[in-house]
Structures are given as structure tokens and as C-alpha cells.
A protein has these predicted regions:
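Short N-terminal binding/cap micro-motifs at the start of the first secondary-structure element
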Residues: 12-16, 41
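Active-site-adjacent pocket-lining segments in enzyme domains
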Residues: 2-6, 12, 27-35, 53-55, ...
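Short glycine/proline-centered loop/turn elements that form peptide/ligand docking sites
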Residues: 18, 35-38
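Histidine-anchored nucleotide/phosphate-binding helix
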Residues: 21
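Membrane-interfacial amphipathic helices and adjacent loop/beta segments
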Residues: 39-46
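Short gly/ser/thr-rich secondary-structure transition/capping motifs
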Residues: 46-54
Length: 183
């Protein structure tokens, strides 16, 4: 079974990372958290320590179905500054693989990969200038082919549900949403 990987860097937005992992695991998706540093403990933007499942060096891109980047500052900047991660995302994207980013991550991570068309995206307000090639939308979550973007923390669950729907079905995503009392 292919896996989804959610990447963590110091300063990640806790709600966007852990909320998405929770939604996907409720939908029985195998999702692994991945530290981009040489240690598994990563500290969120609000001081919450998290122990990642894997280190970036442990990830085989060929096993990936979805590569997911949460936002948060300076977490999203740290993800975008990680050359090995950006190269992995580029390779995955070039093969038609799914990528997802929320908050500042579309601007600070996805802006670093070469895309073959003008994608419709959203991001945290004020970061749009980093995505001059994208068609920006004010929506909370935007799905455009194999790219899913989210606006920020308030949309973390909807972002996770959009990923879940791509991986499974609308029915599974609706069942998970109902179980979480989401409208």
C-alpha cells in the first residue's frame, strides 16, 4: 500500500499538521509524519513538541501517494529551505503525484517547484506574491488536479478531508466529517 507523508520542520502549525494526520488516520489512510531534520522531535510554532514517525532520510518517494506540507512560521520557511524535500516534491510532482500544502506552505514550498501549468491555489493572506504563476482564489481549500492547497488553520480539517476524498471517496470523507461533527 502506498503511503502519505506529512513533513514537519521546527515552527510548523500544530493544527494544520496534526489535524490533517488525524483526519487521514480516521479515514484509515497510512500517513507518516516526517521530520526534515536529523532528529525526530520537532517543535511546533506554539511550543508543542511532536515526535515524528520518520526522518526525511527514511522516506522513499516511490512509496508516496501524497506529500503534504503544513504551514506555520517559521515551519513553512524551513520546509521550503530544505533542498532534499523540495527535490523530492519536484520528483513526485513530475510523475503526476499528489502534493498538498496549507497556509504559508503553498507560497514558501510549492513556489519552489516547477509546475507544468497555471494551477488554481489558495494560501495564507499576504503570501500570494510568492505565487505569481498561480491563479489565486480566496477559498479555504482549493483542489486543482493533483494539487490541493489550504488557506490556514481554520481550514485544517477541510483540507484534510479534501486529501482524504482524493485518496478514497467522497463517501468516506463525508463519513469521517460526520464522525467529527463537521458540517
Amino acid at each position: 500500500m502506498r503511503k502519505s507523508f506529512l513533513f514537519l520542520a521546527d515552527g510548523f502549525e500544530e493544527v494544520e499538521a496534526l489535524g490533517v494526520v488525524d483526519v487521514l488516520r480516521r479515514g484509515t489512510i497510512e500517513v507518516k509524519t516526517v521530520s526534515i531534520s536529523d532528529k525526530k522531535e520537532v517543535t511546533g510554532a506554539h511550543g508543542v513538541p511532536v515526535v515524528a514517525d520518520l526522518l526525511l532520510s527514511d522516506v522513499e518517494e516511490e512509496e508516496a501517494e501524497f506529500l503534504i506540507c503544513p504551514g506555520g512560521m517559521p515551519g513553512a520557511k524551513n520546509l521550503g529551505d530544505c533542498t532534499a524535500l523540495v527535490q523530492m516534491i519536484q520528483k513526485h510532482f513530475d510523475k503526476g503525484g499528489y502534493v498538498a500544502a496549507i497556509c504559508a506552505a503553498p507560497a514558501l514550498v510549492l513556489s519552489k517547484i516547477k509546475m507544468n501549468k497555471r494551477y488554481t491555489m489558495t494560501c495564507y493572506p499576504g503570501f500570494e506574491e510568492y505565487l505569481p504563476e498561480a491563479e489565486m482564489q480566496p477559498h479555504g481549500v482549493v483542489v486543482d488536479g493533483n494539487v490541493i492547497t489550504g488557506k490556514g488553520p481554520a481550514y485544517a480539517f477541510k483540507f484534510g478531508l479534501a486529501i482524504l476524498e482524493q485518496l478514497t471517496s467522497k463517501k468516506v470523507a463525508e463519513e469521517v466529517a460526520a464522525g467529527m461533527l463537521l458540517d
